[in-house]
Swiss-Prot record:
It is found in: Cellular thylakoid membrane. GO terms for molecular function: proton-transporting ATP synthase activity, rotational mechanism. The chain crosses the membrane at residues 24-44. Keywords: ATP synthesis, CF(0), Hydrogen ion transport, Ion transport, Membrane, Thylakoid, Transmembrane, Transmembrane helix, Transport. InterPro entries: ATP_synth_b/b'su_bac/chlpt (IPR002146). Pfam families: ATP-synt_B. This is ATP synthase subunit b. F(1)F(0) ATP synthase produces ATP from ADP in the presence of a proton or sodium gradient. F-type ATPases consist of two structural domains, F(1) containing the extramembraneous catalytic core and F(0) containing the membrane proton channel, linked together by a central stalk and a peripheral stalk. During catalysis, ATP synthesis in the catalytic domain of F(1) is coupled via a rotary mechanism of the central stalk subunits to proton translocation. Signal peptide: none annotated. It is a single-pass membrane protein. Belongs to the ATPase B chain family.
C-alpha cells in the first residue's frame, strides 16, 4: 500500500530511510563537534570566566581601597576644616585683642596728653598767679612806700617794724 506521505509521490512527506536522510551523519558530526568543541570552547570559556573573576576581585579590592582612601580623606578633610576653623577663630580673637590693646593704648595716650595739658595749664596758672601776686605786692609796696612817709610818725614806724619782725619770726 502506497503511503501518500512519501517524497516519491511528489509531495511533501517524511522519509523514514535513515541512510538517505543523513540523519546518522548529522548525529555523528554533531556528536564529534560537541565532544571536540566541549573541551575547546569549555577551556576558552573557563579561561574567560577566570579572567572575569580575577577582574572582579581586582575591582572589588580597588573599591575597598578607594572606600578606605575616601574615608581617610574625609577624616583628613574634617580635621583640616576643624583646624581652619580654629585658626580662623584664633585669628579673630587675636584681631579683637589687638584692637582692644590699640584702643587701650590710644585711651592711655589721650589720658597722658590730657594730664600733661592739665599739668601745663596748672603750672602756667600757678606761674601767672605768682606773677600777679608779685606785681600786686610790688605795686602795693610802691604805693605804701610813697604814702607811708607822710602817714607814719616815728612811733608808728617802730610798731610796724616790730610787727614785721614778729611776723618773720612766726613764719
Amino acid at each position: 500500500m502506497p503511503l501518500p506521505l512519501f517524497a516519491s509521490e511528489g509531495g511533501f512527506g517524511l522519509n523514514l530511510n535513515l541512510f538517505e536522510t543523513n540523519l546518522i551523519n548529522l548525529v555523528i558530526v554533531i556528536g564529534v563537534l560537541y565532544w571536540f568543541l566541549k573541551g575547546f570552547l569549555g577551556g576558552i570559556l573557563e579561561r574567560r570566566r577566570q579572567a572575569i573573576l580575577k577582574d572582579l576581585e581586582d575591582s572589588e579590592g580597588r573599591l575597598r581601597q578607594a572606600t578606605t582612601d575616601l574615608a581617610r580623606a574625609q577624616e583628613d578633610l574634617a580635621a583640616a576644616q576643624q583646624k581652619a576653623e580654629k585658626i580662623r577663630s584664633d585669628g579673630k580673637a587675636r584681631a579683637e585683642a589687638i584692637r582692644k590693646d590699640g584702643e587701650m593704648r590710644t585711651i592711655n595716650a589721650m589720658a597722658a596728653v590730657k594730664q600733661d595739658a592739665l599739668a601745663d595749664l596748672n603750672a602756667e596758672g600757678a606761674r601767672l598767679t605768682e606773677q600777679l601776686r608779685r606785681e600786686a605786692a610790688l605795686a602795693a609796696i610802691d604805693k605804701v612806700m610813697t604814702e607811708l612817709p607822710g602817714r607814719l610818725d616815728q612811733a608808728g614806724q617802730s610798731r610796724l617794724i616790730d610787727a614785721s619782725i614778729s611776723n618773720l619770726e612766726d613764719a
